[in-house]
A protein has these predicted regions:
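Conserved, structured C-terminal
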Residues: 1-181
């Protein structure tokens, strides 16, 4: 495990490829989604993956922690003409939700650990029914899912837009002094 030896920076957005090219990463535009490329960087190797969690063009850059600040500075300088700005976890979280990327234990919990008594979240409730392969003749829950597909789901994961003051992240919302589900 080399986690404590590496630093990672995520560069996301429509100009991310142009920024990396300006930084000197030649042929970065040839990277396909989920590709990993390696580039020389101050006598070390910079690993770049064409990945991200925002639903936009994006890359993740990996370097030893000793060169992390230097990488940040060069990345920031290369992106200055593009209006590069640092962003945090909340912005990433909003972008991934807008892109429809859901996370286990954040947006839903697995059936065995669900917080609602006697309520297992199904793929149809989460908008993931298209992932269920009913061509497969036998799997646990197949009959229940076929029934739900035919009759519809009782619950559905929805996006809620709130204008004005927003509730805190992971806040419980109340209606008539009762916790909403």
């Amino acid at each position: 495990d080399v986690s404590d030896q590496l630093a990672a920076i995520s560069l996301q957005g429509p100009t991310s490829c142009a920024v990396l090219k300006k930084m000197g990463l030649s042929n970065i535009e040839t990277a396909k989604p989920f590709d990993i490329m390696h580039f020389p960087f101050h006598d070390q190797t910079l690993m770049v993956s064409r990945t991200g969690f925002t639903g936009d063009l994006g890359y993740e850059l990996w370097i030893t922690h000793e060169l992390a600040i230097k990488m940040w500075d060069e990345l920031y300088a290369a992106g200055e003409d593009h209006g590069i700005q640092p962003y945090g976890e909340t912005a990433t979280d909003m972008a991934r939700l807008e892109a429809g990327f859901i996370m286990p234990y954040v947006d839903f919990t697995e059936a065995l650990k669900t917080i609602r008594y006697k309520h297992d979240q199904t793929p149809f409730e989460l908008g993931l029914g298209w992932l269920v392969d009913f061509e497969k003749k036998h799997f646990n829950g197949r009959n229940a899912l076929l029934k739900e597909k035919k009759q519809g789901s009782r619950w559905k994961l929805l996006k809620l837009d709130i204008e004005g003051n927003w509730p805190a992240l992971e806040a419980i919302m109340y209606n008539d002094k009762k916790c909403s589900e």
